[in-house]
Amino acid sequence: MRIVIISIPAQRKPPPDYVVALQKGMASMGHYVDVIDAWTEDNIRLPAYEYIAVIVEATSLLGGKMPEALGRILSTRSGLVGKKSAAFLKKTGPFTGKGLSNLMRSMEKEGMMVNWSDIILNAPHAEALGKRIGA
């Protein structure tokens, strides 16, 4: 399966270790996986992928506010309606569930079918989650 991971850290920086671990876990199951940084990539062809995984790090300590790159990347892409997707949120504070709910709402607003969501605790947890895709 062709999978794209859209990495949206709270600030502009290279993909964090948990994103690389998620990619490693998905690739170990035989999937073709690309990682895209939402802050720097502009020419993303999302319809070419069968599955879209969005992994976000909340910008507020309470975990409810999403980075501005999330809205920009989802609203400017076409071909997202009906696309199977996963929503992942890096645990940053006590109210991470609210942030995950906001992330899923943003994705579903653009027509994506979110069929998997989870809160990522650390890199080994992300790799274990990656191995569960398609299983």
Which role does the model predict for each range below?
Residues 2-10, 14-135:
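FMN-binding flavodoxin-like domain, especially the glycine-rich phosphate-binding loop
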